[in-house]
């Protein structure tokens, strides 16, 4: 939503959410590249955090190494003000600045398998929140 340009997109989304009284079950940000999964950061109640932590074995096939408190991402941060649980998907960041904001930051550089694993983690989180709740 553009944290690189002052976060105006995230703030506008938050203002629209409040204005229209939109309900969010959760917000998830993925803003560190399309690399293989490493972990999930979560900002919510301790009870919800423990529930997500209990799902770790279900995320093991995607190579998720940790689920930690804190570190959701700048674009969704405003939503915390209205009680929305926030999550950040954290991929392996070793190659991030090899591509990010460079001429090489193109879709053909993405490793298909890494992107599939990352999508699997995000899709699984959505499914688990939907079926098991917070």
Regions found by a protein language model. Name each.
Residues 1-52:
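Acidic/histidine-rich catalytic neighborhood of metal-dependent amide-processing enzymes
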Residues 35-134:
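Active-site-adjacent substrate-binding region
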